[in-house]
Structure formats: structure tokens, C-alpha cells
Amino acid sequence: MRKVLAIETSCDETSVSIVSNIGNTFKIHSNIIASQIEDHSKWGGVVPELAARKHLELLPFVLEKALTESKIKIEEVDYIASTVAPGLVGCLRVGSITARSLCMLHSKPFLGIHHLEGHLSSILFSENYPKKSFLTLLVSGGHTELIKVDDRRGMQRLGKSFDDAAGEAFDKVGRLLGLSYPGGPAIEKIAKNGDPMKFNLPKCRISDKKGGFLKYDFSFSGLKTAVLRLVEKINLDGKTVPVPDIAASFERVVAEVLVERTIRCAEDHSLDNVVVVGGVAANNTLRKMMISEANKKSIKVHLAPLNLCTDNAAMIGAAALFRIKFKDHLSSLKLGVSGRLSIEQANTLYEENPPF
């Protein structure tokens, strides 16, 4: 049994987890998450400097709690991993420096993990996760991407958002509607009392320079602007803004766009397994719609466990375990962090000469 201590500090969650695997079975021994939502809610979004300082404050306590809850001593851990890209650089440094320091203190090998690969790996804690090639919809506050994953974890991005990520659009529309931060859960909650067909909001597409539209790519900036114009018009007319109806209509359109393009991409690439991960993957409307539409096409849907949709260290540990199992990858202790790194460049994190 391989055991990994993993650290995640790429944005506004401070998380430490102890995970292990035996063959194809992955187990979480502890997964402690300290959220900073209350610290950032008054600003309507994450303040990078504040987030980094909070990680410095919280990480020692989160680390101690993760070890205590797992009943595993750090000397018994086989590997130590941390998120190194992409993310907020100051936040990434806190986790990475801590992880590499622990590696030096306890003579443990280090793995730097790509944050998006971590999200992809959250599905490993689900029953009957796909063992062959599959399509992943990764949909979160910072990313909306369609990624093909082969049976050896080779990754190819097939679609992306050209502006706002879906989760970012939820936050911005939530703010427009006067809802609390983060916008995703707030919109989902109030949308339950609204009519999702009340407003005909646009499904924005990206033009292809060769003609037509890019079939697998996303754009949510125009949808956000449409909601803004709608709210402005209602206010100018002197009427009460029907927040539940707007929230429900917005939520429906986002889910429809995500589902339609995911199913189209899966069909075009002959992939009969779709994985949905990331913070927005917790949205119930999206989950139900994806399953319903995929069933019509004989495509099986694998949903990330609800408690592992948002940022957490267990998914980082799972990514590390998978790397060790199939590719025997280790990172240099000289590896730094980066705010940007495409998923196709994840293998560079294990080169003898680090990319940063």
C-alpha cells in the first residue's frame, strides 16, 4: 500500500490529506479542508494576498489535524505531494514550500501536481470509475475545459472557455443579483423557487476563423452581460427584479451549454464514458441534465463525489498515486510554482530540469 501526504493551497482552500491505494482501490484516510469563504465574501471574490496570508496561518494546524485524523505518522508516509500549477502564485508557494521542506526533513520523495489533473483524479474515489479512455468536463471557478484522458492518463484538451469560466460566471451573476459569495451555491439555492423557462438567455458560441463555430468551446461572458442588461431593464421599468426566475434561467442555460457540448464532443470522439469534476460539478441541475442527456446517447456519466468537487488535497494525493503507479514519476525539489500551465504540459513537472 502506497501512502501520500498531499497539500492543496492553489486558491482559497487550505487542505491536507492522507490517501493510499492498493491496486485500483483508492482510499482517503483524512481530508481536512479549511475554507476562506468568510474571509473573502465581503470582497465578492478571492483576494490573492489575503488568501496567501491565510494559508500561512492555517496550514500548520490543518497538517496536524490531517495526520491525527488519519492515525498515520509522517514517517509512515511514502510520498509528499502539493499543487504547483496553475493557481495564485503566492498561495501555491505556501503549499509547495511546506511540502518540499517536509520532504527534506523526512527524506521523502516529492511530486508537484497540476491542479487540473487533481480535479480529474477526484473521480478515482468513485465506485466503478472508468478504466479506459474517457472525456472529462472540468468545470470550476477558474476553468471550463473538455479533456480527453486515455487509459494511461495521457491528456488532450479538446475544448475550453475563451473568457469567463462557468464558476466565475456564477460568481459574477450572483453578485449582480445581490446574492452571497460564492455565487454557485447561492444561485442554486434561490433558483429552486424560480421558473427556469421565464427568460430566454443566450447560449454564446465562439466563431471559427475557418467559418461556423468552434463545437467544443465555451463563452460565458456574453451570458453574464445579458443578465446585467436584463436586470438594468427591469430596474428602469420600475419593476421588482425576479431574482429566483433569473437565477433559475441562468442556471438552466449554463447547464444546457455544458451538457450539449460535452455530449457532442464525446460522440465525435467515440467516447462512451464522461466524467464531470470541479466545483460546478456539484450543481444538481447540471448533474441531472448530464445523466439524462447522456443516457439518450448510451453514454455513461461518472460524477465526482459531492465532497470532492471543490478544491481539496485528496484529489491531489490521488493524482500523485496515479503518477507513481503508472509512470513512476517524481519531481525535483528545485521545482517552483507557476500561475499558468496547460494540462498538456503536466508531464514537464517531472523532468530533471524543472520548467520553473
Swiss-Prot record:
Its EC number is 2.3.1.234. One of its GO terms (molecular function) is iron ion binding. Keywords: Acyltransferase, Cytoplasm, Iron, Metal-binding, Transferase, tRNA processing. Substrate binds at residues 138-142, 171, 184, 283. It is an enzyme of class 2 (transferase). It is found in: Cytoplasm. Fe cation binds at residues 115, 119, 311. Pfam families: TsaD. Its cofactor is Fe(2+). SUPFAM superfamilies: Actin-like ATPase domain. It catalyses: L-threonylcarbamoyladenylate + adenosine(37) in tRNA = N(6)-L-threonylcarbamoyladenosine(37) in tRNA + AMP + H(+). Binds 1 Fe(2+) ion per subunit. InterPro entries: ATPase_NBD (IPR043129), Gcp-like_dom (IPR000905), KAE1/TsaD (IPR017861), TsaD (IPR022450). The keyword ATP-binding does not apply. One of its GO terms (cellular component) is cytoplasm. GO terms for biological process: tRNA threonylcarbamoyladenosine modification. Required for the formation of a threonylcarbamoyl group on adenosine at position 37 (t(6)A37) in tRNAs that read codons beginning with adenine. Is involved in the transfer of the threonylcarbamoyl moiety of threonylcarbamoyl-AMP (TC-AMP) to the N6 group of A37, together with TsaE and TsaB. TsaD likely plays a direct catalytic role in this reaction. Belongs to the KAE1 / TsaD family. This is tRNA N6-adenosine threonylcarbamoyltransferase. It comes from Prochlorococcus marinus (strain MIT 9312). The lineage of its organism: Bacteria, Bacillati, Cyanobacteriota, Cyanophyceae, Synechococcales. The gene is tsaD.
